[in-house]
């Protein structure tokens, strides 16, 4: 078990899959956002992904047609990118919305299970540390719960961090509903669509616990945020630094 006071020191509770994955995959990003409090604007690809999820949800809640879902997604995207400076990137990502929804709509609309909701908040504890997060689309039948996490991408590639996220959601939902939970990732590109089934989460949960212990051990020895940032060395070759706002924050925190 981990002492919650370690994470409370920097107001990190409840912890979340996104915080854990940030610590694992981009430690500087974890420090910038969750320790120093930088709030970076969403990129056009991120807004496009949220727009597609938002638009398609109207099929389940209001019985919208494909064209109506697409229009909802366009409206969401246009509103979210009003202040985007990179006009070429903005136009490029918007063009992906319709072909992606053309693939998603027939795939997800064929389920016969009861629709539980979208962006359902779920909670659990891992090694005594409270976790909270939000699922994508959740369904229920007599035997089990099924969660489908929609990932819209440029390439049909699965990410290990997505699987760790779903392992946590599986644990939380099984505790809440007292029945088996299937977690699936639906990866969609403008031309292809495919499922990734996560059948065995036992080793994923072990990996999550090890990462959480590692994070706690680092935070435990630091009394102030400057001490924590001094333990992380920025990798200037990381693609994450393509974002100008992150480079500016890096300059402030690390001086490079």
What are these regions (language model features)?
Residues 127, 174-256:
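Metal-dependent nuclease catalytic regions and adjoining charged, substrate-binding loops involved
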Residues 7-12, 16, 27-39, 80, ...:
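Short amphipathic alpha-helical segments and their helix-coil junctions
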Residues 117, 122-168, 176:
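Non-catalytic protein-protein interaction segments used by genome-maintenance enzymes to assemble
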Residues 20-65, 119:
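Nuclease catalytic cores
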Residues 55-120:
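A non-catalytic, helix-rich entry segment at domain boundaries
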Residues 38, 153-156, 202:
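Short, surface-exposed beta-strand-loop junctions and turns on beta-sheet-rich folds
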Residues 44, 48, 93, 97, ...:
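Hydrophobic (often cysteine-bearing) scaffold residues that line and stabilize catalytic clefts
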